Amino acid sequence: MNNLLLRSSADIIALVPAAGIGSRMNSDCPKQYLSIAGKTIIEHTLSALLDHPRIRHVVIVLNPTDTQFQSLEVVSDSRITTVTGGEQRADSVLAGLNHLAHVTGNDNCWVLVHDAARPCLHHDDLDRLLQLAEADEQGNMACGGILASPVRDTMKRGRVGQIIDHTVERQDLWHALTPQFFPLMLLRDCLSKALSQHANITDEASALEYCGYQPVLVNGRSDNIKVTCPEDLALAEFYLSRK
């Protein structure tokens, strides 16, 4: 992909960081390559993105040692490009953003960042999130936002020894999900600044927060789970069977 020209402002590029090794899965295989219902997790994730009419292209950021992605059927899809990632997730996202900044031909485009291990994304969630770009076009100066779900359970803050320190008020607490959706150049600049100053960046929104922005929380489905632990596989398979 030497030059990705977007046909209109409605076209969206997705960025999927997939350079992690998934140590919590207790598996020899990175979690994005584990199989659910005959397809790898990352293939389910890519299908959820590429089946949406507004997503024109997906950039996947891979570990330098990755040898498995090239064996998947989806590798032949012309709408997919791969780039090499960095040591941490934030480094990989920045590598993808730097690549996109050189090939989009559009300084005003927006980018959708989505976890490789979140295969259960629904298009109704995605539609609500993509409305943020429309708000920006209408002059509302949206800086972007993320899918998130309100915290439902009682939250406890612990201390050393796994002892309860106190109960945290759950009002206004949200679980941050993906996709997270921002203007490409704004996200790149914020992430670059935050990393250069050794800030603790755990998702894309935290880079914007570090630079003084306040992204929007877009209410998303709680079944948009990230496959992190072995028990998540059966749950993801159940959710996918009901899509």
Curated annotation (Swiss-Prot):
Chain positions of site Positions MEP for the nucleophilic attack: R170, K226
Enzyme Commission number(s): 2.7.7.60
Pathway given in the UniProt record: Isoprenoid biosynthesis; isopentenyl diphosphate biosynthesis via DXP pathway; isopentenyl diphosphate from 1-deoxy-D-xylulose 5-phosphate: step 2/6
Key word Iron-sulfur present: no
Reactions catalysed, as given in the entry: 2-C-methyl-D-erythritol 4-phosphate + CTP + H(+) = 4-CDP-2-C-methyl-D-erythritol + diphosphate
Residues at the site labelled Transition state stabilizer: R24, K31
UniProt-listed SUPFAM superfamilies: Nucleotide-diphospho-sugar transferases
UniProtKB keywords: Isoprene biosynthesis, Nucleotidyltransferase, Transferase
Stretches of the chain forming a coiled coil according to its record: none
GO molecular function, one term: 2-C-methyl-D-erythritol 4-phosphate cytidylyltransferase activity
Annotated GO biological process: isopentenyl diphosphate biosynthetic process, methylerythritol 4-phosphate pathway
PROSITE patterns registered for this protein in UniProt: ISPD
Function description: Catalyzes the formation of 4-diphosphocytidyl-2-C-methyl-D-erythritol from CTP and 2-C-methyl-D-erythritol 4-phosphate (MEP).
Assembly notes: Homodimer.
Membership in a protein family: Belongs to the IspD/TarI cytidylyltransferase family. IspD subfamily.
Protein's name in the database: 2-C-methyl-D-erythritol 4-phosphate cytidylyltransferase
